[in-house]
Amino acid sequence: MNDIQPKDSCQNPGGQEQIQPRVRRGITSVLAMMFLVIFGSLSVAMAIMAQGNLRAADSALHVSRASSAAQTGLVFGGRRLESEARRWVVKKGVIDNEFGSDLWSGNIAVDGSEVELLPPMGYETTSDPSGLMEALLDAHLADDHSFDAMPGDNLLPEIFNGRRLETKPIQLDQGDGNMYFRLSYELVEDLENETRVRITSTGEDRGITRRISMEFLVTKKIPFAVVSPNRIMIGKNVLVEGPLGTRFGMNPGELNEGNGDPIVMRSDFQYLDEELDEALAEFKELVMEYDVDGDGRLRPNHPEEGQALSGSGGLSDVDGDQYVTEFDLFLEAFDSNSDGRVIWDSERSEDAGISDVVVEFENIDNQLARLIDRAFADRNLDGVVDEMDTQLGYNDGVLDTYDMYAKVRGTLSFAVKESDWDTANGGPWRGVVEGPVLSETDEAPVIFEASEELLRDVTTGMFSNNQDWYRSQTDSTPDLTEQSDSNLGSDPDTEFIPSGSGEWESVPTGSPNPYDWIRRDVYRNMVFTDVLIPRGSNARFENCTFTGTTYVETTTECTHPNWNYLGALDRIEDSDGNVTYEDKFSGLEPAPNPDGSSDIQDTKSWSNNLLFDGCTFIGAIAGDRPAEYTHWRNKLQFTGPTRFYLDPDDADIQDQDDADQILGFINGFSQEQTDYFTRSMMMMPGWSVDVGNFQNEQAEEWESTPVVNLRGVIITGVLDARGTVDVYGTLLMTFRPVENTGPLFYGGSPDQFNTTLGYFGPDDGDLEGTNLDSSSFDGFGEIMLRYNPDSKLPDGIPWPITIEAIPLTYTEGAY
């Protein structure tokens, strides 16, 4: 029997068998299982990926937190280093590698003679640190948020190899020991003979670490364009790029309602238009009442300052810089086509690509216009003045918002209290301080009650040891007479005129209010090298070149109250026009001779009153340090196109006809000479120095007017600059007038002695100055003072250490 089951079939009409297809019902289950496997695998894969992503995200989070901790630590370490460095007040001018290494490691005497240590801020110690590294250790010991993250941290902070400080970890969240940073401070050897400290910050978050480092320069800088113990006067047509500081007003009798103001600033826009003068006067009243931060500007959107502008009539923000200043009033007065700018030079504007202009300020005050147009030369802050800066408004013949006008570009620092000044002045101090002050964004425009740590007096006595080196440079060279004879014998263009054959000159020369008269030896067209000008020379040098050290000798023991006046002369003219020169004073007690041999009846031959007209100095001028300020006798005047050069990269040198000769002299200096010259090109503490002319002498082609160029750190007792002057550096004044002593022995007030930039008259306290309302007054000149933050300093000035970050040394993962 066949047990094979027949297939389902049926007979068709032809009798043939037809096979029916079998239904396979299990395929659905198979497909379902396949999709189940696929989706299950995908789910597992997604779960694995999600878990991986979570782990990656968690790791990335910890990496980010560790990096943030490291960045925080680097900022913290930099600020701590800066804070502790400020405690160290040193007389050393340049912090070279040797001195910096000793200061860092503590191999230095902290006895107040060369190094002074100020108390710590925010914590106390039982003993003073021996050096900067130990001071950092003390500061970290006082931290509240340091803790022990791992074994061995309990031994920190600790100094290793006398060069490196390792600190305890510092947690970022109180009570959370998972996220923290630890710091390392290490002295770095540098090829440029600088002192650098490398801060390494290691951030950690739950076992993940990130390490970064950066180097910081240990240096010394005086962060002011002018530091003066006497009052500062900034006149019209004077711009300052840099902070100003004075401690005038702290002594009795200095503040008063007359001229006893720590600083006086005059508007640059006076004397241009009568209606503008009236508008400036009204604006000053508003500033005195509403200016809350002392910057001489009013903000339309400020809740208090804006009140001054709501009902002020024509006062508006013309240049669109969000402030109303004197510059807006100037634009309003001279912008004839209301385009928000004033064209003053069509040739400049065409060269800058500005066409179809209407000249609106032509030949009204070209020196002022050029001064504003060429201020803040590096407009894009790239370190180079080029066509890009011209596109941003530099020297383009247009005065507008791109010039970013400011009378002072920096902070004004005063030791006095604001209320004390206002009380003595009889009104707000802004009544005598005109013009806008534009400070850095993170700094206040005005600081009152500046501490001695921030703003220190510079005195004549600080430079007692500096003269020795400068004088030694003249020991082995021919004296003044020998060098003069050599010039006369080799160059027919040179000339010497003895004083007996010369003309009488007023002292100061050119002043409308002279206090003495003198006849001088005259030297013309000569070249002097490392020359000593002996006391009693009282000479005039015209178109002479001085290379190396020019040393001015005088009698230092000049404290007798009559030293200024012995031998002084008056010019007497009778009705017939005959002129004689007679004693100005009679019956004066003579001054004792320093050697005790006899009395001195005429101190001119014991002093030095010199005039340099159109001279060139390649190197430095220095002199003996007088024990008292005797401006009638110990005085230097620089007039005409006087030039000072030392930097071979100075762009101004290439514009000179004698550029090759200048560069030859500069390149011939030894490294030691260059080092001393760069610290101060004018080392004349205690002397009276006049720069420029008492009358604003302009050339027939006004742009060819000679400019007096001063470079570097300028150290004098009192300095007056007038006319056309360009200063790039820092002015350090040393004379502080005190009632009933020195030049005030017979009366007078301290406000009679000022550091003056620009033209002022006797009514302003400048007794030598010109009456600005007189018919003979011929314009305000053009003075630019630019602070050089890279200026080296001479030894002797006690000033705190400064720390500067060096961004290009930032490194991730190194060290």
Task: Provide a role label for each language-model segment.
Residues 82-86, 417, 631:
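Short, solvent-exposed secondary-structure capping/transition elements
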Residues 106-114, 160-166, 180, 191, ...:
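Repeat-unit-sized solenoid/scaffold elements
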Residues 632-635, 641:
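Long amphipathic alpha-helical repeat/alpha-solenoid cores
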Residues 100, 105, 111, 122, ...:
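Intrinsically disordered, low-complexity domain-flanking/linker segments in eukaryotic proteins
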Residues 2-229, 248, 266-290, 296, ...:
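Beta-strand/loop motifs with alternating small/hydrophobic and polar/acidic residues, enriched
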